[in-house]
Amino acid sequence: MTGTTLDVREIPPAERHPRIHEAFADLESGDALTLINDHEPKPLFYEMEAEVEAFDADGYTVERRGPDEFVATFPKR
């Protein structure tokens, strides 16, 4: 699986979800978006699960690497 890594920690909060959705849309089927965030992206997970048909929710993973660093993988079907 290949894909894109997007570190959103320095992006203003109001701009994060649109940028994430754009990056995800640019992926090929079978690729994944790796997201680095300052909090667990659970609201984004639920948003993607409800709104993005190509999101493979079963393949989603998240790892806390530090107090302000979460790395989540959003695979695309």
Model segments located where?
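Short, hydrophobic/π-rich interface segment
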Residues: 24-59
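Surface-exposed beta-strand edges and their flanking turn/coil or helix-capping segments
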Residues: 19-23, 48-50, 75-77
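A generic structural micro-environment signature
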Residues: 12-17, 33, 50, 68
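C-terminal edge-of-domain segments
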Residues: 57-77
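A generic structural signal for short, non-catalytic loop/turn and secondary-structure boundary residues
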Residues: 1, 28, 55, 65-67
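An N-terminal amphipathic alpha-helical segment
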Residues: 1-29
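Intrinsic-disorder/low-complexity, polar/charged segments enriched in Ser/Thr/Lys/Arg/Asp/Glu/Gln
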Residues: 3, 30-34, 69-71
